[in-house]
Amino acid sequence: MSEILELEAKSRTEFGTGAARALRREGRVPAIIYGAGKIPISISLEEKEITKYYRRPAFISQLINLTIDKKQYKVLPKAVELHPVTDIVRHVDFVFLEAKTQKMEVPVVYEGKERALGVKRGGYFNIIKRRVILLCDINNIPRNVTIDVTNMPIGTSLKSSEVKLPIGCSFVTKKEFVLATIIGRKGVKTEIEGEQQVAGAMQ
């Protein structure tokens, strides 16, 4: 599960392009927190710190304790604007967390896909879902969903009903869907059929 980051922020009362440029000259980044029916709060963050955290894996699904003027808020990153050349963070949108659960889009990691049974037989591992939307307990937001696919044979599909999700998480959609398949390359079917014919002749 994700660790909870601790961030310090300052309130800001000046807005617009000029104010944002002035902040960046001071080594700070403009940001805003909104959602949950609350009045938005405009803040600034230390540029080096927020850029460092942004470059960590799965920053968008990262639960953050944000302290502003000695008051603490639980927030999630919603959107990040980057400098087009340097990839330094230029602006961040956060959302307030008030409910006990939160919809999250998290990456899927297919562990062992290069050595899956079906791949060893000449199949191709076809990823259909690289990210999935989950409903998560805000205290147990995963960095990703890791699925072991080493035993997946050729000509099969991995369905959502077969996936064991992290504790406190469920798929938002109740309808079953396919995350990945292993499809046969040209010649694989012929090879399998040949093996089946040999096996039949030996019986």
From Swiss-Prot:
BP term (GO), one: translation
GO-annotated molecular function:
5S rRNA binding; structural constituent of ribosome
Q: Which Pfam families match?
A: Ribosomal_L25p, Ribosomal_TL5_C
Q: Which domain of life is it from?
A: Bacteria
Is Nucleotide-binding there in the keyword field? no
User: InterPro entries recorded for this chain?
Assistant: Rbsml_bL25/Gln-tRNA_synth_N (IPR020056), Ribosomal_bL25/Gln-tRNA_synth (IPR011035), Ribosomal_bL25_b-dom (IPR020057), Ribosomal_bL25_C (IPR037121), Ribosomal_bL25_long (IPR001021), Ribosomal_bL25_short (IPR020055), Ribosomal_L25_dom (IPR029751), Ribosomal_uL5_bac-type (IPR020930)
Here the disulfide bonds are none
Enumerate the UniProt keywords alphabetically: Ribonucleoprotein, Ribosomal protein, RNA-binding, rRNA-binding
Q: Which GO terms describe its cellular component?
A: cytosolic large ribosomal subunit
Q: What does this protein do?
A: This is one of the proteins that binds to the 5S RNA in the ribosome where it forms part of the central protuberance.
Self-association and partners: Part of the 50S ribosomal subunit; part of the 5S rRNA/L5/L18/L25 subcomplex. Contacts the 5S rRNA. Binds to the 5S rRNA independently of L5 and L18.
Its family remark reads: Belongs to the bacterial ribosomal protein bL25 family. CTC subfamily.
Stated name of the protein = Large ribosomal subunit protein bL25
**Gene responsible for this protein:** rplY
